[in-house]
């Protein structure tokens, strides 16, 4: 496991942190899983609950140990501040928590945060960059697309097609005891008279109760106390007060023109470095291309840049020009019958 960790993280871009420090932490108790499995087998219910038995067997085969990572020192984070100029306050909060865990046996414990702001200001982008900096993985839970209330906490194994929730999957099927879980657009969670889609968060956002979180499918306790929670929303009025009170709330404003240019420049370099084909292109964007990208939200910037890279490649150029970028927002392809 440690060799796999070192192999994975030797390629993480430098942010002034060095390699993360990894400790092993048990995310469940094997004895409890064994009892549940033996109980099903003794009752002759192993065929009826085949998916549940397979889950227990998979847990026992992998074992309970997962990486719990934290930066090896107090971070410089200059690169992140440059890439996320409108996220100064949440980055400051992260830096404080990292400083507390530095040079101690304590694990990194971040207070759950709510990033409040209009669509397209880079809230989910922030979460991914934070996970990269900390050396852990990201799991996205899109509440606006939720079709059932059990997405976070799983559904009872009594139901047909039941399966574990996102928290269980991130911890048991993932590599880390402290993944970043992003609950996206928490204010758009559908309300249901039979099931509160946010109900699981009441215990998950509290460190003490999260230590023994029980997924409704697996019905065994998992330790979710190390999860790094980031929620995003456009309207805090739609979020229950008890959940708001469990989080640090940060208002994220759209970046100004100068900050938007820096974001576009960083995003260009990031995309270029992420792909093998990036070696075909020059290191930086020209000022006229930056001028066109700056008014766009980060999400649209990325789409525009990908279009630009493709058009430049088709023309055999190693740089993007204004003509490579899409005009008048995202293009829509018309389909229909030819008359």
Regions found by a protein language model. Give the residues of each.
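Interdomain "pre-motor" coupling segment immediately N-terminal to P-loop NTPase/helicase cores
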Residues: 24-74
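Conserved C-terminal "switch" segment of AAA+ ATPases
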Residues: 66, 175, 236-242, 253-319
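AAA+/SF3 P-loop NTPase mechanochemical coupling elements
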Residues: 175-178, 213-232
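Conserved catalytic/switch belt of AAA+ P-loop NTPases
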Residues: 183-222
